[in-house]
């Protein structure tokens, strides 16, 4: 795994790359064009594999939930945009993706994967890296899974909601926090309000 330039609390590495857009067209996109929105940027190893379609379809199927949070989901792999399109055009029952509601970025030179520290150099593919970037372009969360285990869309939604809550209210979110749950005031005395309610 490469060390990369992605660091929590710092601007996420910008990129410009060709993506297959939800309308099936090719378009060059930049991370910077999403400034003002949260971004969930995730890498997956390869098109036409086994765990990858389950993750990508899960994110695509719930793209509207992210959109309601002013959050754009973007997927990326080292495959060409032509390969992405072929996979999208392959029926789900044959291991394909079917129509997508999120852009899929092509990183054939592996520069984006390297920049984000997810390149598995010995195989020339990406680990399952996921990055939550806030509306100011600051990297707020990083997870990197080894190849055989997929990610939870529910957990990513929860994290976006939690970061947005802390941005807006200045309170912090305890373990397992969900919208509507109690939060903690980050103050020695005021935090006792939360802890006094615990069993």
From Swiss-Prot:
Keywords: Acetylation, Antioxidant, Cytoplasm, Disulfide bond, Isopeptide bond, Oxidoreductase, Peroxidase, Phosphoprotein, Redox-active center, Ubl conjugation
SUPFAM superfamilies in the record: Thioredoxin-like (SSF52833)
Protein name: Peroxiredoxin-1
Induction trigger: Up-regulated upon exposure to arsenate.
Modification Phosphothreonine, positions: 90
Compartment(s) of residence: Cytoplasm
Organism: Cricetulus griseus
Additional observations: The active site is a conserved redox-active cysteine residue, the peroxidatic cysteine (C(P)), which makes the nucleophilic attack on the peroxide substrate. The peroxide oxidizes the C(P)-SH to cysteine sulfenic acid (C(P)-SOH), which then reacts with another cysteine residue, the resolving cysteine (C(R)), to form a disulfide bridge. The disulfide is subsequently reduced by an appropriate electron donor to complete the catalytic cycle. In this typical 2-Cys peroxiredoxin, C(R) is provided by the other dimeric subunit to form an intersubunit disulfide.
Regions annotated as coiled coil: none
GO molecular function: thioredoxin peroxidase activity
Region called Disordered, residue ranges: 176-199
Highest classification ranks of the organism: Eukaryota, Metazoa, Chordata, Craniata, Vertebrata
Modified-residue entries (N-acetylserine), positions: 2
Function: Thiol-specific peroxidase that catalyzes the reduction of hydrogen peroxide and organic hydroperoxides to water and alcohols, respectively. Plays a role in cell protection against oxidative stress by detoxifying peroxides and as sensor of hydrogen peroxide-mediated signaling events. Might participate in the signaling cascades of growth factors and tumor necrosis factor-alpha by regulating the intracellular concentrations of H(2)O(2). Reduces an intramolecular disulfide bond in GDPD5 that gates the ability to GDPD5 to drive postmitotic motor neuron differentiation.
Active site: 52
Pfam families tied to this protein: 1-cysPrx_C (PF10417), AhpC-TSA (PF00578)
Gene designation: PRDX1
Thioredoxin domain boundaries: 6-165
Catalytic reaction list: a hydroperoxide + [thioredoxin]-dithiol = an alcohol + [thioredoxin]-disulfide + H2O
GO cellular component, one term: cytosol
Annotated Basic and acidic residues bias: 184-199
């Amino acid at each position: 795994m490469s060390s990369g330039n992605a660091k929590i609390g710092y601007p996420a590495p910008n990129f410009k790359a060709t993506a297959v857009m939800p309308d099936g067209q090719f378009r060059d996109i930049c991370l910077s064009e999403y400034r003002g929105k949260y971004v969930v940027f995730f890498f997956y190893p390869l098109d036409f594999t086994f765990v990858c379609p389950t993750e990508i379809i899960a994110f695509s199927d719930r793209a509207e939930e992210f959109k309601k949070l002013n959050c754009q989901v973007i997927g990326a792999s080292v495959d060409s945009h032509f390969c992405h399109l072929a996979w999208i055009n392959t029926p789900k029952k044959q291991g394909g993706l079917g129509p997508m509601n999120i852009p899929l970025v092509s990183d054939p030179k592996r520069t984006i994967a390297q920049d984000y520290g997810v390149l598995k150099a010995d195989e020339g593919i990406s680990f399952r890296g996921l990055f939550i970037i806030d509306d100011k372009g600051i990297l707020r969360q990083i997870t990197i899974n080894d190849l055989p285990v997929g990610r939870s869309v529910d957990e990513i939604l929860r994290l976006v909601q939690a970061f947005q809550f802390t941005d807006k209210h200045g309170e912090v979110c305890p373990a397992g926090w969900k919208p509507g749950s109690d939060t903690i005031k980050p103050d020695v005395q005021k935090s006792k309000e939360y802890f006094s309610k615990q069993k």
